């Protein structure tokens, strides 16, 4: 597949920013799109992969789409084709983008107890192909990056049992040399980095963002807090049931609950979800099947202050996109507090001074451009979107590794120092290993 898009014209503005798109066999991307009806056991993905991966346009706006949360690698690829510093001379590039649709590939097999060789086949063939390319030899793959539009755990199968989850993409030695972008990273790894889930809003101009931000500032928010989701009865440690009970039992009728289940399909309609977020001051974001939720980014888009219960739901994930000062834009309530049974979320939120709430909401609204992916067919002039920030993060990381290799240090750490990989979350967020604040959340003993 020929992947080159708009090539850079001005070499000065692109110094240290050039990216080369690696040509891959069509089975790595285009063929998957052609077989879109086979990509998900429960859902026909074909309509969601239209419009450059944005999905079908919603009736009520030209910039709103029914975007599927697992179509990010297609969106990213189409935006990369319009990247202003593309080059078709690989030796000139600071980074090499590998447009393998890893998430679409593995999604075909996640719920099947098939031969694990089928799950791993495309990933193994990819690295065998890359190793033979001259671009790989330059840095042994350390300057390569890919986007896998699912959570990290889908690519980290721990055993060769057919009942174990996922494939082994991130376990391959060659891929460990690369930088992988996912919608949820492993806190104990230094090869994958989280970037925002896609929202429904894909503006084509800066003015659309300005208008939306101002609308969110002016919104009347009758709900103190809200929750969009479903119970997790099968997850023993889940706090969702307690959160739902507290929302439904709010003494001042301060909470609104939008139940997501397979019968009513309330949450499949973007208008329902966004309506609730726009009516709420705070939006509860407990872990679900994994640490993170697409709902976090939809709520930010709605100007709603997120409330997190685990630091891996946002703080140690989206290091390039969210402020390090997490109290400026969110509320953190430890999971163990909620599990005590006598802790009232409503009371905790009511204790926050009004002026603090106003300041937090403004920070959330400022985050909106950073968590949306603008329409690939357009270019923002004054804002950097989630794609722009991710590319800057990748280039910075690769440059650091390149300088490290020149100094003779080849540890592949994003902060260019040697530390145990299991403490990646701590080093990347706190800048060192001494802080003990969140150790209990990440202990694997």
Annotate each language-model stretch with its function.
Residues 26-28, 101-105, 151-154, 200-202, ...:
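Short, solvent-exposed loop/turn segments at secondary-structure junctions
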Residues 272-372:
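Catalytic binding pocket for nucleotide-activated donors in carbohydrate/polymer assembly enzymes
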Residues 9-15, 331-445:
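C-terminal amphipathic helix plus adjacent low-complexity
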Residues 219-232:
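Conserved donor-binding/catalytic core segment of Leloir-type glycosyltransferases
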Residues 213-220, 242-297, 301-305:
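Donor nucleotide-activated moiety binding/catalytic core segment of transferases
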């Amino acid at each position: 597949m020929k992947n080159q898009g708009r090539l850079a014209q001005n070499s000065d503005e692109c110094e240290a920013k050039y990216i080369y798109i690696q040509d891959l066999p069509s089975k790595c991307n285009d063929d998957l799109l052609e077989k879109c009806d086979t990509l998900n056991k429960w859902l026909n993905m074909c309509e969601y992969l239209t419009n450059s991966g944005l999905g079908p346009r919603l009736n009520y706006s030209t910039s709103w789409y029914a975007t599927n949360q697992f179509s990010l690698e297609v969106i990213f690829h189409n935006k990369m084709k319009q990247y202003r510093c593309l080059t078709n001379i690989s030796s000139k590039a600071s980074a090499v983008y590998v447009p393998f649709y890893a998430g679409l590939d593995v999604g075909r097999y996640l719920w099947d107890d098939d031969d694990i060789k089928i799950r791993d086949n495309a990933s193994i063939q990819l690295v065998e192909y890359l190793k033979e390319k001259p671009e790989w030899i330059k840095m042994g793959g350390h300057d390569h990056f890919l986007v896998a539009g699912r959570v990290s755990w889908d690519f980290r199968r721990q055993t060769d049992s057919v009942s174990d989850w996922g494939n082994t993409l991130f376990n391959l030695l060659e891929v460990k040399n690369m930088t992988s972008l996912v919608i949820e990273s492993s806190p104990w790894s230094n090869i994958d980095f989280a970037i925002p889930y896609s929202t429904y809003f894909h503006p084509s101009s800066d003015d659309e963002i300005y208008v939306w931000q101002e609308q969110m500032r002016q919104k009347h928010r009758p709900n103190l807090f809200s929750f969009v989701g479903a119970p997790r009865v099968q997850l023993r440690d889940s706090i969702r049931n307690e959160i739902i009970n507290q929302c439904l039992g709010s003494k001042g009728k301060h909470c609104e609950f939008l139940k997501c289940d397979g019968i009513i399909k309330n949450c499949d309609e973007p208008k329902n979800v966004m309506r609730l977020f726009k009516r709420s001051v705070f939006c509860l974001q407990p872990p679900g099947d994994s640490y993170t939720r697409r709902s976090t980014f939809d709520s930010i888009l709605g100007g709603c202050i997120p409330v997190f219960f685990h630091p891996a739901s946002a703080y140690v994930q989206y290091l390039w996109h969210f402020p390090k000062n997490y109290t400026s834009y969110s509320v953190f309530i430890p999971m163990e507090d909620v599990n005590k049974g006598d802790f009232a979320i409503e009371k905790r939120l009511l204790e926050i001074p009004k002026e603090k709430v106003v300041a937090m909401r403004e920070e959330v609204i400022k985050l909106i451009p950073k968590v949306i992916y603008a329409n690939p067919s357009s270019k923002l002039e004054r804002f950097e979107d989630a794609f722009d920030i991710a590319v800057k993060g990748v280039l910075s990381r690769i440059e650091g590794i390149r300088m490290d290799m020149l100094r003779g240090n080849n540890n592949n750490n994003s902060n260019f120092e040697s530390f145990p990989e299991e403490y990646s979350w701590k080093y990347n967020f706190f800048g060192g290993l001494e802080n003990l604040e969140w150790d209990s959340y990440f202990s694997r003993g």
